[in-house]
Amino acid sequence: MTNIIELPEVLANQIAAGEVVERPASVVKELVENAIDAKSSQITVEIEESGLKMIQVTDNGEGMSHEDLPLSLRRHATSKIKSQSDLFRIRTLGFRGEALPSVASISKITIKTATKEVTHGSLLIATGGEIETLEAISTPTGTKIKVENLFYNTPARLKYMKSLQAELAHIVDVVNRLSLAHPEVAFTLISDGRQLTQTSGTGDLRQAIAGIYGLNTTKKMLAISNADLDFEVSGYVSLPELTRANRNYMTILVNGRYIKNFLLNRAILDGYGSKLMVGRFPIVVIDIQIDPYLADVNVHPTKQEVRISKERELMALISTAISESLKEQDLIPDALENLAKSSTRHFSKPEQTQLPLQSRGLYYDPQKNDFFVKESAVSEKIPETDFYFGAVDNSVKVEKAELLPHSEEVIGPSSVKHASRPQNTFTETDHPNLDLKNRQKLSQMLNRLENEEKSVFPELDYFGQMHGTYLFAQGKDGLFIIDQHAAQERVKYEYYRDKIGEVDSSLQQLLVPYLFEFSGSDFINLQEKMALLNEVGIFLEVYGHNTFILREHPIWMKEEEIASGVYEMCDMLLLTNEVSIKTYRAELAIMMSCKRSIKANHSLDDYSARNLLLQLAQCQNPYNCPHGRPVLINFSKADMEKMFRRIQENHTSLRELGKY
């Protein structure tokens, strides 16, 4: 008797499911890709309990014949390749014949399908990979696959599922990526009876982006295009002012397949050059058409890793396309647009309404003279709206938003304000080592800044400036050269840090509420973690599709920083699963000190230079900027005399050393 046996097919499928089906989103991905391969123009995904209870994918594609239906649950049975040569010219999303058998082996699956050539369709029901029912039924052309009780026979996998909201966010992300890859298909995603995503299927990629990321985001994206003999690159990239805190918004498509590729991500960032702030990433959708012979998708069961021949040439093509597109744009922000974005509003006294602050019990020290507290612009709440159906009070004036080509009219109340994300106003050249995304490095920086000891600064006499960058001063210890940007950065950092003080969680109502748009997956994740935002005084309410409304703001947040501040806090929460006023304010102090400091090649008059040195002398640590760079260097009198050889060396000792 041999010790080596051939595993039963059901067991082999369950083993394969460990690689193919990691979570409910994996099932959605495989079923939707099969629907796309079947040349569907409409695909509807319905889920219950984030896919753990039920996943149903309905399409209007080619369907399967009665004879092919049971074969679809056989491992390595496929209609997409027939010979070895086909493996090197794959244009379909699936080809292994593993997905459906793997899914069927760990769930109960029901398939209804019909082709247009026959008068009736077929029904198949299987549990744990074993077919229980196979019969003829009446059903429309296309395929409907229902997966129920996922992982019912693999409890270990079920145990490690994340929360329902987290799993739902993964599903939304998968559907969004596939809808970007195939704008010619109309996608609909419904969760527990509520529609989360819907695309038009017009074939216009820009329309698909608008449906996923929102109209305001799409308006700030540029078309790119480039090609050579092997590759054709097209898509949309965001202006440098529109960024996110992670790479999740960078979508790379190869022949209609969403892939992950570090080198191509690097090429995208290279295309932006120094226009992006360190730790920030653009919103990008790039479609790459390539000869299948140059791409190997048979690398991993999920098929998200693709190996590409001539990868360096493709990187150069992408970088050039992005850089050329950005060159054609005026990257200087529009002053009128910035004025419109300013949340500082002035009203005559009779129009102001003072409401009592709603105390939430945290300590507030008025002796700090907290400059974030304002006596401005508060009002009663606007009329309540039906958030899911967008019913607005008839007394509220509405105005039409600017429309994209072929898009439906978007109407919104003028009594709300669309929040804009913060723009990047300094680059890597200011601080190449500053990475606000690296929470460990940021924490170390903040700890170092908190533990700084008071230093004694020498008395300096300013006498000149070089190249609009360095200040010269003399003191009793010799010559001092000061980096003017680093000096003012230290001064302003300590100013903003001291102004932060203790915070109060009291709230002040907004005269004009703010609307905050997010992608579908981020919107769902934020809903799950909303209690953490509430702890720091940010109370967002659902307001329509992937949108929150803010009706009141914590008084520790300046009114003009509400839009950027709330987005920053939400990004922090999505990135680290926690929010901290202390960390946010410290980050803000560091960034504000850099952005509002004088730069290199800026000439100072004598009065300004002397005033800067006076302010620097009053700092707790005048010797380093917040990022750790030196503010000034010193040449002592002895150093100067050595450089000019006024101090003679001991010639005898040099002879003894064999130098003479």
UniProtKB/Swiss-Prot annotation:
Function in brief: This protein is involved in the repair of mismatches in DNA. It is required for dam-dependent methyl-directed DNA mismatch repair. May act as a 'molecular matchmaker', a protein that promotes the formation of a stable complex between two or more DNA-binding proteins in an ATP-dependent manner without itself being part of a final effector complex.
Keyword DNA damage among record annotations: yes
GO cellular component terms listed in the entry, alphabetical order: mismatch repair complex
HAMAP family xrefs: DNA_mis_repair
Gene Ontology biological process terms, A to Z: mismatch repair
InterPro entries: DNA_mismatch_repair_CS, DNA_mismatch_repair_MutL, DNA_mismatch_S5_2-like, HATPase_C_sf, MutL/Mlh/PMS, MutL/Mlh/Pms-like, MutL_C, MutL_C_dimsub
SUPFAM superfamilies: ATPase domain of HSP90 chaperone/DNA topoisomerase II/histidine kinase (SSF55874), DNA mismatch repair protein MutL (SSF118116), Ribosomal protein S5 domain 2-like (SSF54211)
Gene Ontology MF annotations: ATP binding; ATP hydrolysis activity; ATP-dependent DNA damage sensor activity; mismatched DNA binding
Alphabetized SMART domains for the sequence: DNA_mis_repair, MutL_C
Name listed for the protein in its UniProt record: DNA mismatch repair protein MutL
Similarity comment text for this entry: Belongs to the DNA mismatch repair MutL/HexB family.
